[in-house]
Amino acid sequence: MNKLVFCLMGPTASGKTGLACELLTHFPFEIISVDSAMIYRDMNIGTAKPSIHELQRAPHYLIDIKDPVESYSAAQFCTDALSLCAEIIKRGNIPLLVGGTMMYFNALQKGLATLPEADEAVRKRLEEEALSQGWDFLYQKLSQLDPVTAARIHAHDTQRIQRALEVYYLTGSTLSTYLTGPHEQPDYYFVNLALFPEQRSWLHERIAQRFDAMLSEGFIEEVQQLQAKWPIQINLPAMRCVGYRQILEYLAGHYDYETMREKGIAATRQLAKRQLTWLRHWEGALFYDSQNVGFNTDIIAKIREILDNTVSN
């Protein structure tokens, strides 16, 4: 049991946070957040960060660890998460990793690939091509060269599009090949519990309702406060978080409120689609439909069964 790590993964708005808080009442878990948006301070509403009350009941590690103008990589996450896992296990508890940043889960469990260093000449060539042809053209090129990676990143995520194409041009191999290749893996046994709503319409409706709730709770004001406090630019990694980019563009006068709302909801649904793509191909995951009544009871029973078997063995 001293090498057992549970992972609760799933798309945005599938109910991960509420379930994680419930699991803490049944098991000696300590929660590590696996969310590339919740790492940022002052970004609370738009990231659906657990409430103060929830954090008092169920503290989360790796929340509020970076300023919005800072960056954070999958490699940094692995270092932090593995260190926390060791500390939690040393205290006699069990790590529970909760979130939807599938690239972090992948890097943690399968190891990080040794990717080539950035090449200024290749990057300049790609930027010139983007200026002349547009980033949509480069995204389509990536979709042809590496459809697996293209399906996992947003069509407007220029930084990741550029990096994926750069890796291909430098090595002749796709980024997805690197990520799925054999790497040094941590000495833990990961149990992957995946929330996987079968009805996309149910998830889409929840996403729309949650985005509207965020707007009502002051999402726009939160972005304005970020602008007042930090030198916020649209190309910052923090502004890749869904909703923030759309509100920034709305505040800049690029489109009206209703268009911003529609774009924010659409971007969140696209994020959920990419997360589900990761999960669909996740080997050995235990899938639960969070739309079903009693799914949490099924998960609790499975965890108890795994822990009982681990102790008896």
Curated annotation (Swiss-Prot):
Site (Interaction with substrate tRNA): 101, 123
Enzyme class, spelled out: transferase
Gene Ontology molecular-function annotations: ATP binding; tRNA dimethylallyltransferase activity
EC number: 2.5.1.75
Superkingdom classification of source: Bacteria
Keyword Acyltransferase: no
Residue pairs linked by disulfide bridges in the UniProt entry: none
Names of the cofactor(s): Mg(2+)
Chain intervals for the UniProt region annotation (Interaction with substrate tRNA): 35-38, 159-163, 240-245
Keywords noted in UniProt: ATP-binding, Magnesium, Nucleotide-binding, Transferase, tRNA processing
InterPro entries, per the entry: Dimethylallyltransferase (IPR039657), IPT (IPR018022), P-loop_NTPase (IPR027417)
Keyword Magnesium applies: yes
One GO term of the biological process aspect: tRNA modification
Binding site for ATP: 10-17
Swiss-Prot/TrEMBL catalytic activity: adenosine(37) in tRNA + dimethylallyl diphosphate = N(6)-dimethylallyladenosine(37) in tRNA + diphosphate
Signal peptide (UniProt feature, chain positions): none
Entry coiled-coil feature ranges: none
Residues involved in substrate binding: 12-17
Task performed by this protein: Catalyzes the transfer of a dimethylallyl group onto the adenine at position 37 in tRNAs that read codons beginning with uridine, leading to the formation of N6-(dimethylallyl)adenosine (i(6)A).
Family: Belongs to the IPP transferase family.
Classification via HAMAP family: IPP_trans (MF_00185)
Summary of subunit composition and partner proteins: Monomer.
Protein name per the record: tRNA dimethylallyltransferase
Source organism (scientific name): Legionella pneumophila (strain Corby)
Name of the gene encoding the protein in the UniProt record: miaA
